[in-house]
């Protein structure tokens, strides 16, 4: 294992990533903190081992950038050939995701509409939305006003009928 220097702390995998991986892999198992630390150290050492071997392969092929093929060759030469098919699948998935991101970011560029025009159109849409919202609020206010007027009229007619009924009772008392 590599010696523990101050720089090694900077080169470890984030513990949150390891914790997430452990929970996804072993959801019903409790893992002690020292076991988690051991997993972090093993992952870090594995990455150092693979990257060093990939770097040597890269240098032998007189390249300056480590490519996925160099990493795959490193896995093979270190005896991890059984992982290569899965690594290739993950590599393909990563390429697909990256391609989708590039396509999504270039959609705006492919529209052929200047940014100023897009901003103007956006402002128009915002203005229309504000106008529609104001109209809806106005309609709701008018409906509330009509409901209040109807309630007042109903209360007034109920009050008038109550007063008419009570004055008739008084007339009936006078007749007695």
Curated annotation (Swiss-Prot):
Organism for this UniProt entry: Gallus gallus (Chicken)
UniProt name for this protein: Protein Dr1
Localisation: Nucleus
Residue ranges annotated as motif Nuclear localization signal: 100-103
GO biological process: negative regulation of transcription by RNA polymerase II; regulation of cell cycle; regulation of cell division; regulation of embryonic development; RNA polymerase II preinitiation complex assembly
Gene Ontology MF: a single term: RNA polymerase II general transcription initiation factor activity
Role noted for this protein: The association of the DR1/DRAP1 heterodimer with TBP results in a functional repression of both activated and basal transcription of class II genes. This interaction precludes the formation of a transcription-competent complex by inhibiting the association of TFIIA and/or TFIIB with TBP. Can bind to DNA on its own.
Compositionally biased spans, kind Low complexity: 152-167
Domain of life: Eukaryota
Subunit structure: Heterodimer with DRAP1.
Region Disordered: start-end pairs: 152-176
Keywords in alphabetical order: DNA-binding, Nucleus, Phosphoprotein, Repressor, Transcription, Transcription regulation
Entry-linked Gene3D superfamilies: Histone, subunit A
């Amino acid at each position: 294992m590599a010696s523990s220097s101050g720089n090694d702390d900077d080169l470890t995998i984030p513990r949150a990533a390891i914790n997430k991986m452990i929970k996804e892999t072993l959801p019903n198992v409790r893992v002690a903190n020292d076991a988690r630390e051991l997993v972090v150290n093993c992952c870090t050492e594995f990455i150092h081992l693979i990257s060093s071997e990939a770097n040597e392969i890269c240098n032998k092929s007189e390249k300056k950038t480590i490519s996925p093929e160099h990493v795959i060759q490193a896995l093979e030469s270190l005896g991890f050939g059984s992982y290569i098919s899965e690594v290739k699948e993950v590599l393909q998935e990563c390429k697909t995701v990256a391609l989708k991101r590039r396509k999504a970011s270039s959609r705006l560029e492919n529209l052929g509409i200047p940014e100023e025009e897009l901003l103007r159109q956006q402002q128009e849409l915002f203005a229309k939305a504000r106008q529609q919202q104001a109209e809806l609020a106005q309609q709701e206010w008018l409906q509330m006003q009509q409901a209040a007027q109807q309630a007042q009229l109903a209360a007034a007619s109920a009050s008038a009928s109550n007063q008419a009924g009570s004055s008739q009772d008084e007339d009936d008392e006078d007749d007695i």
